[in-house]
Structure formats: C-alpha cells, structure tokens
Amino acid sequence: MSLTLLFDLDDTLLDTNMDAFIPAYFQALSKHLFGRVSPDVMLRALMHGTNLMNESYDPTRTLQEIFESDFYPALGITKQELVEVIDDFYDNIFPTIGGHTRQRPDAAPLIEWALSQGFRIAIATDPLFPRKATWHRVRWA
C-alpha cells in the first residue's frame, strides 16, 4: 500500500494576496458579464450564493447545486444562457489574474521529492471556486 500525502492548496502550496485577488476576480468577472448582467447585481448574487455555500450543512446537495440554485435566479437569467460565457471566463480570463498569487518556494521541491519517493499526492482546498478555477490555481502553485 502506498502512502498518500495531503497538502492544502491555500497558504501551503500557493500564496494568494486576497486583498488584491478578490477585487481583481470580481472586476474581471463583472467586465466579462457586462451587457448581460449589471456588475452590482452580479456581485450581490455572487456574494449571496457564496455565503449560502459557506452556511450549508445539507449533505444531499453539492455546493455547486446550492450556489447555482440561488445565483442564476438572482441574476434573472438561466444557467443555460450564461454557461458558455462563464466557461469562456474561466478558460481565458481567470488565468490572467494569477499574478496576485505566488508559488510557495519550498512547495514544488517537496511535491517533486514526495513523488520521487513513490508517494501519492492529494491536494485539498476550500471548494468555493468552480472546478476550472481550482485547476488553474493548482497550476499556479
């Protein structure tokens, strides 16, 4: 049986200047959705949906289900109407805000060493970002 090492992404593998990252994220998403959703409405819906995710203890629903059941109705638009635009944001725009993060200096050598020893690696993070955003954050680390 091989040993699996669990690393937390945030502040273990990746430093994020949240004071710069969150405003850049909100601004980029607002700009990308402009013309479809007003920035004020989008920000309120995003914050409310995120708060619902943080407050949920419902084991029968995923955080994505909780978020989406509130977010899209608050925008007054269906998921189907925005899914391509949001996918485009996370594919092409979100990666540009990675400059507000930096790799932890010892993280990559530690991961490389663990892999060279035959250990399996698992990375944990707070699941507030969509999967595509999380994968970008892992790559930044």
Where are these regions (language model features)?
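Active-site neighborhood of HAD-like aspartate-dependent phosphohydrolases
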Residues: M1-H48
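A generic "structured core" feature
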Residues: L13-D15, H100-T101, W140-A141
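Short, flexible/disordered intra-domain loops and linkers
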Residues: M18-I22, S56-P59, R131-K132
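Short, surface-exposed alpha-helical segments at coil->helix boundaries
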Residues: P23, Q27, E65, R131-H136
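A metal-dependent, Asp-based hydrolase signature
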Residues: R44-N92
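Substrate-recognition element of Asp-dependent hydrolases with the DxDx(T/V) motif
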Residues: D88-G99, A107-R139
